[in-house]
Amino acid sequence: VIPDPLSGKEEQVTKLPNGLSVLILKDTRFPLVSTRLYVHAGSSYETPDQAGISHVLEHMVFKGTDSRPKSAISQEVESAGGYLNAATSYDYTVYITDMPDRHWKLGMDVVRDMAFHPTLDPQELESEKNVIVAELQRGEDDPGSRMFKTLLADTLKGTPYDRPIIGYEKTIRALTTQNLRDYIAKYYQPQNMLLVVVGNVDPAEVLAEAEKMFAPYKNTAPLKEVMPYEADRLPLPGSKPALVVQPGPWNKVYLAAALPVPGSSSYQSATLDVLAYLLGGDRTSLFYKTYKYEHQLVDSISVSNVSFERIGAFVVTAELDADKVEPFWTSLT
């Protein structure tokens, strides 16, 4: 049991015999229960030739499971007044339900079903590839998305974080259902998952139900430990600071500068979070007051510590007019 110093509540964390971690937090303020099933595998765990497979799998689980045909999953959740979603990040994939408290078991069962029993129909996969490629192309039309992808590709070059979560059209098109099944077998193991349940629940009842639902699942292979990258060795030896300019049909200039920093596994990450907030976290921050209000060089500016599991990037972004880029950059550097 872990006490939360901010809320005064206690979070109950239990590891089941098969290695599944279960975190339960009772919160009676609302008649709701949020359930999340985290899989410790995202785009940073992919091979270069299968870039985007985590995101493709996230899409495919909505196409049906062994016990719930296509569209039945969302219909079942929504008809009970709930919400269903999923998301892919660099370091994890998460399956999400928010339910009225009387239907919390359904929420847990649905995330279990999606993670462990997706149908993965080949025809559905080919159809969904078109949807994902269209999503990728829309991202290319968005200056912020395009800038962030380019920024990480250069700042974290030589690490798995230099690839976009969504992957590339070539790698997406090449994926097969067998690729997805192999990926599931490698990473979708209880020992590599965290089940989180928060809301108006009895923790003992939730734990008992989790043990019942997830006990049948066994681990299929040992997990390889991954080590953090040394931020002070990036960019890689021999490389030089990069300047990337990408023209586009926009009236403004979207500028970003970044350098590699330690990831979330380092104590320094919290220090960098504070520094980022002081420099450019909101309208009262140093950079915002200096470059937006005093010098009037930018329309907006922000600073963030983009922290991943094994590495991070300290990022300054700004939106400004083209004729103000040079004086802004000179002042910043």
Residue ranges, per PLM feature:
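Active-site SXXK
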Residues: 51-65
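Non-catalytic beta-strand/loop surface segments
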Residues: 1-45, 67-105, 138-192, 216-266, ...
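Divalent-metal coordination cores built from histidine and acidic residues
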Residues: 107-111, 126
